[in-house]
């Protein structure tokens, strides 16, 4: 409308004349199979058909061909997919979808997560962690061919209804980032791997995804994907435990798998502390330990542009190593440059700091950083005594974090 309002009267009339000369043509294909193939191959929008377009047309084809779709199944499919399209439009508009689903996220991803979240009567399990969206769609097409005609209508109804519920549950989880501190930290700060989504969203559908379970998913994600390993199959196949044994069975399996992977919880905690700068779970662990006092409103202040952008701040700056200032290094309690190198990237020398403040404090001395930290939106940072920071304080922070990881954060994963 904005563009039209800027047109002159003559320009408006020119466009109106073009519209009046346009002819609307109706092309009708009586054969449902050919109609569907034509719909999928002829696309006058100039863009590829969405996966949901193809899926809807496929199901309507089976409804028409084998289920006498005019008796209501066509309308059922049409109504439910209308809702699915509306839900996905809201998902795409979410401020958090690129953080949660990844930069290349599309509607096919949710279709794929759903395929691995449920077992439907009459077909083989559709999901596999490494299967692409297109291959999952082709597998569904193959399975539809094998379903007994007497069970086809029931399958289509249950599949379409469950698919809509899955899209809605995915949207609900995204929306909870703005209403729940636990969800914000687990999904936005920790960014749980999508290979958990088949189980995660299935729990959400069944109203079983409470804060405790979501925190367990975040910790399991750290063990499976943020501690040097990539346990893709194990993460994806957790759904088997849920479908067979329910929520408690799923939680027990997650804990058992984490125990098997960690083996030595003390060693794993020490490794996380020593390698904190290179750890992708640093911010989540930092917030869980130091920022429990921060409520939802406080946490949301850290995402002014709807993206979590905290950075790892070296309290003792890295440039001290480059300057090779032995006197300054020794004043901070270190024996020499090599001694500082051993501690520079450990947890004790790091805090989670807002990106603008981190840029402002880069290479500044401790007195200058003290003023910068006071501008942080994180209470822990504002209270942090930077001026008196030395090696002994750094070591104390490392020791406290290590004990907290062992006794609190990873305690459920300790061998009994």
What are these regions (language model features)?
Residues 3-10, 17-23, 176-187, 257, ...:
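Active-site-adjacent structural elements in folded domains
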Residues 16-19, 27-34, 188-193, 209, ...:
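Secondary-structure capping and boundary motifs in well-ordered enzyme cores
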Residues 1-120, 124-127, 363-365, 370-415:
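Glycine- and hydrophobic-rich flexible loops that cap the catalytic core of alpha/beta enzyme folds
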Residues 52-55, 65-69, 78-79, 83-286, ...:
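A cross-family structural signal marking well-folded subdomains
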Residues 44, 48, 60-65, 206, ...:
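Short, well-ordered loop/turn and helix-capping segments at boundaries between secondary-structure elements
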Residues 222-343, 347-353, 359:
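Intrinsically disordered, low-complexity N-proximal targeting/linker segments that flank membranes
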Residues 39, 51-56, 209-219, 229-235, ...:
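Composition- and surface-driven signal marking solvent-exposed, interaction-prone regions
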């Amino acid at each position: 409308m904005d563009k039209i309002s800027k047109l002159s009267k003559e320009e408006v009339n020119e466009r109106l004349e073009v519209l009046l000369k346009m002819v609307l043509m109706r092309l009708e294909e009586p054969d449902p199979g050919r109609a569907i193939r034509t719909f999928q191959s002829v696309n006058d929008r100039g863009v590829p058909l969405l996966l949901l377009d193809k899926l809807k047309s496929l199901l309507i084809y089976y409804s028409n061909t084998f289920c006498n779709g005019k008796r209501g199944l066509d309308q059922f499919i049409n109504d439910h997919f209308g809702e699915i399209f509306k839900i996905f439009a809201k998902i795409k508009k979410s401020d958090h979808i690129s953080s949660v689903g990844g930069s290349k996220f599309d509607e096919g991803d949710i279709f794929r997560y759903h395929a691995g979240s449920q077992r439907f009567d009459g077909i083989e399990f559709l999901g596999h962690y490494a299967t692409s969206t297109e291959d999952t769609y082709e597998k569904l097409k193959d399975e539809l061919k094998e379903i007994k005609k007497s069970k086809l209508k029931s399958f289509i109804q249950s599949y379409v209804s469950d698919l809509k519920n899955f899209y809605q549950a995915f949207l609900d989880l995204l929306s909870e980032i703005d209403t729940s501190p636990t969800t914000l930290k687990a999904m936005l700060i920790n960014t749980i791997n999508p290979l958990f989504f088949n189980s995660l969203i299935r729990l959400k559908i069944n109203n079983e995804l409470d804060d405790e379970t979501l925190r367990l998913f975040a910790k399991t994600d750290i063990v499976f994907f943020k501690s040097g390993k990539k346990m893709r199959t194990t993460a994806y196949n957790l759904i088997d435990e849920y479908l067979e044994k329910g929520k408690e069975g799923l939680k027990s399996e997650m804990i058992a798998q984490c125990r098997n992977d960690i083996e030595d919880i003390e060693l794993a905690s020490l490794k996380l502390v020593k390698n904190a700068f290179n750890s992708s779970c640093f911010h989540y662990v930092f917030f869980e330990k130091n920022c429990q006092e921060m409520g939802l409103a406080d946490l949301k202040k850290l995402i002014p542009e709807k993206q979590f952008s905290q950075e790892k701040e070296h309290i003792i700056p890295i440039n001290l190593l480059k300057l090779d200032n032995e006197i300054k290094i020794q004043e901070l309690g270190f024996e020499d440059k090599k001694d500082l190198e051993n501690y520079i990237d450990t947890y004790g020398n790091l805090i989670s700091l807002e990106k603008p403040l981190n840029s402002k404090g880069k290479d500044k001395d401790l007195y200058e950083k003290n003023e910068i930290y006071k501008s942080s939106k994180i209470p822990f940072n504002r209270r942090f005594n930077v001026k008196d920071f030395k090696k002994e304080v750094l070591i104390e922070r490392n020791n406290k974090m290590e004990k907290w990881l062992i006794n609190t954060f990873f305690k459920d994963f300790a061998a009994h």
